[in-house]
Regions:
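Terminal-region recognition feature
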Residues: 1-150
């Protein structure tokens, strides 16, 4: 990850594309970002680089993984730019940016925490939820390792 000032100059010949994800991570918010990536990848004149600017307190981890998989599958490099607060599921999306294309602005705060959830139901339902919790935790750890080299 690089931490630096961002200065964007207006350049009509620029082949860069920008998307602002400045809200909680939900299926609705990531749907727009997924559509943006798909449209660019199937465009007749695709951009050379896509810039996903993220300010998010976190949110739905499954929705985040939908966007993460889309970023990973993009044939166009996706630069992720952390702006303000990048927390929880928002951080998971941020680190999915292509290697060498992750930027944090100087005043960005990041937050990572242990996955947590609540459960209720009958005993067999609770056992199934515990299994799903363990699988999700393993996916998160694998994602951190892949993106950070830790």
């Amino acid at each position: 990850m690089q931490k630096m000032n961002i200065q964007l100059k207006e350049d009509q010949s620029s082949k860069h594309s920008f998307f602002l994800l400045m809200e909680e991570v939900t299926l609705t918010s990531v749907k727009q970002a997924v559509e943006w990536i798909f449209e660019a990848n199937f465009s007749e004149e695709p951009p050379e680089l896509m810039n996903l600017i993220i300010t998010s307190p976190g949110g739905d981890l499954n929705a985040a993984f939908a966007l993460i998989d889309t970023i990973r599958g993009s044939s166009i490099p996706v630069r992720t730019i952390g702006l303000g607060q990048v927390a929880s599921a928002g951080l998971m999306i941020f680190i999915a940016g292509h290697k060498g294309h992750r930027l944090l602005t100087p005043n960005t705060s990041i937050l990572s925490h242990q996955y947590s959830w609540g459960a209720f139901g009958k005993e067999h339902e609770l056992f199934a939820q515990v299994k799903e919790f363990d699988l999700t935790t393993k996916r998160m750890i694998a994602h951190y390792k892949k993106c950070t080299g830790l």
